[in-house]
Amino acid sequence: MRLKRALLWSFVLATPMALPQIAVAESAVDMEEVIVTSRRKNESVQDVPLSVTVFGEEKIKQLKPATLRDFDGLAPNVYIGMNAAGPGNSTIYIRGVGYPGSEKTQSPQVAVIVDDVQMGSSTGALIDVFDVESIEINRGPQGVLFGRNTIGGNIVVNRVKPKFNEFGVNAAVSVGDYSARTIKARINIPLIDDTLALKIGAISREQDGFWDNATIGGEQGDIDFASQTIALRWAPNDDFDAILTYDRIDDNSEITPQDSLHDGDNRFVTFADKETPTSYEVDQLSLRMNWDINENMTLTSITASNSGEDDTESDFDGVFIGSTNFPIVQLHPKRPQEFDYFSQELRLAGAITDTLDFMVGYSYFDSELDYVQFTNNIIQLPAAFLGLPAGVPCAAVPGLGLRANPVIGDAFCQFPNDKSTQFAGEDVESTAFFGSLTWRPTEDLEFLAGVRRIDEEKDGRNRYVNHSTGTFDAPGQDPHDFTGAPQVPGTSYTVSDDWQDTITTASANWAFADNARAYVSYSEGFRSGGFSIRSVNAATAPYEPEEAEQIEIGLKSNWLEGALTFNLAYYQLEREGGQFISIITLPAGAIPGTNTIVNNGGTAESDGWELETAWNINENFSMLFNAGTIDVDNGAFTLPCDVIDGCGADPSGTIRNLGGGSDSRQPDKSYSMTLAYTRQVGPGILSANTGYKKVGDFLLVNTGAGPNNRLFEGDYGLWDAQIGYDLELKSGDRLNFSLYGKNLSDTEYKEQALFLGGPNAGFQGWGAPRIWAFEVTYSR
């Protein structure tokens, strides 16, 4: 690693010597300056010494995204997908680092930050982007300035602020495929000139599901989402500005059906034998205050409180009871949860001298989670596994209460329903002190150094109750109604631990020409340790923090008199104690059917290149192009089966060698390109754009329970397009008409998959098919 860093420094020093010799051609179309907040202050994206992609309000309008998920692949080495285990659940990876799960007790590796408030978990992170003025995707560890759980990077969302002295309306109505209908509105109301303004917004989005259920009939995957926001902005003088925001979210969408890994070729036909309703209700209150103490110093306070509950019913087996899947042929959990988050951050930033800036801060985070899971599962095994000769019925096995598979017969034997309730929870308290210094010895040279001290404590609790009766449920029986069932106490434990860490960052940034600068940066990240909430015993619950360090070199440049930007970066990332999930099937009769543990794997090293270009070709045409590569080596680690009562069919004492090779969602290459066209036509402006993104082969899932628990996804490409007409009315108001389509080639691709303790049981989730929509937008 040291040799590689030495080579990187040599590259940085050598690069500027060649670049100024490149001729700069003329162009009539300048590139508009883009402002980012990647270092907790407003700066031009071309001046920031790190890899960041930013989408401004106009670009967001052009892309026609519904949620954050629609930004998948639009920045180098960035994957944004869904997770079907919960409402609005995100699976976000940057540079091959991310979290594929859904538990609120295991922190994501990529943080989503909305108006300076970090979301507490991946639930609900695929936010609607109607009321958004910019989205910044920062790649690489961001731990010093943004805190824990940002070792892959972060996505910073800045929403539209209330405006003084200006009444405004922005509303959109759209209809589309699968009975899609969306209504969005935002109103800005000035209350007191230059002092008080109010913003009110609301969203309603509905759509029928893409999936037909061949077992129970009907459609699945419906969308039913609503949200409201109210923001009050107060500025009593030129030195103080405060925004108080209230948000309410009600999401009653169905999760994406858990389609079996073995269901056949039609990706939108599922054989699951259970509906999968969800509910997600959240109330959030935040207060952001800025006080310019003097012309050289600003104090910022961000306070946020988030309280909510969600409930998800799943069919994790993805099949009907007569399937050949084993060892699990039925796994039906219901997971109601209640959660509360509170966070407070204080930052003091300013200038010590004309060449020396500083920032110091304090961060506090507190959360409480109460979790209940009702589980109803059936274990199924081939009769041969039980030693039954051909022709001998399953019921002949004494003392187990077996029955034959209802469809296939005695070739597969099923154990009676295992029923359980789990009561669990976790309390978290995390504090941090951080600071940075920025020194500019000359106008063209800048150095930054920063440090963060993290102190975190977690308390976990878990208790199981067994409701099994040794019998099978009657057809049509509610799988989660345990009224009158036995109440046999199972495993019960409490756990507690704390962790401390100090992480650092440093960068050097050199504007070696009027149109170009080179930089080198070093950054570290910290991902919280904790306790697996789905662990069945105290021995397998704990896992340690994950740490990351990265070195990056980059070039940022403007050409053709500002019409072309060309940015190039190379990074090396090393992770210690990477957290990998293993799902282990438990023996028949053991509740809740599976044991989920979090392993701290070996060292994982990766490196890659990233290219970003934007070119205003002329007054009418523009182009965006980005590309990324990932070369990764994940160290192997072992899973001692004796501490988890055996790994499925393996006896206690078995040691499984896991890890090595690729982890999930680490394609070796990916790229995207967007072409846009605008022209005055009649009284309005005609616009059109088309985009294509390509993803290379990658490992979609590795559940860490054995070499067969891997599923690879082949390379695929997605094509989107949009055409619109923008008309200014006599009143000065504007109307925009837009027709757009996504995945126009109807490409088949998987967004997620999960093995349930073995290669013959598990589910997969497919990406959306080709869809179109027509939207009308009014603004004044």
Where do the model's predicted regions map?
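N-terminal periplasmic accessory domains that precede
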Residues: 68, 91-93, 113, 137, ...
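Membrane-embedded beta-barrel scaffold of Gram-negative outer-membrane proteins
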Residues: 288-316, 511-527, 542-638
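Structural signature of Gram-negative outer-membrane beta-barrels, strongest in the C-terminal barrel
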Residues: 233-237, 348-351, 363-365, 424-574
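Gram-negative outer-membrane beta-barrel transporters
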Residues: 358-359, 443-447, 567, 572-574, ...
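Short acidic/polar hinge/loop motifs at secondary-structure boundaries
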Residues: 102-103, 110, 115-141
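Conserved C-terminal beta-signal and adjacent last beta-strands/turns
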Residues: 336-361, 367, 551, 661-780
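Transmembrane beta-barrel wall of Gram-negative outer-membrane proteins
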Residues: 168, 175-207, 211-254, 280-287, ...
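Solvent-exposed loop segments that connect transmembrane elements
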Residues: 211-219, 256-273, 315-334, 374-423, ...
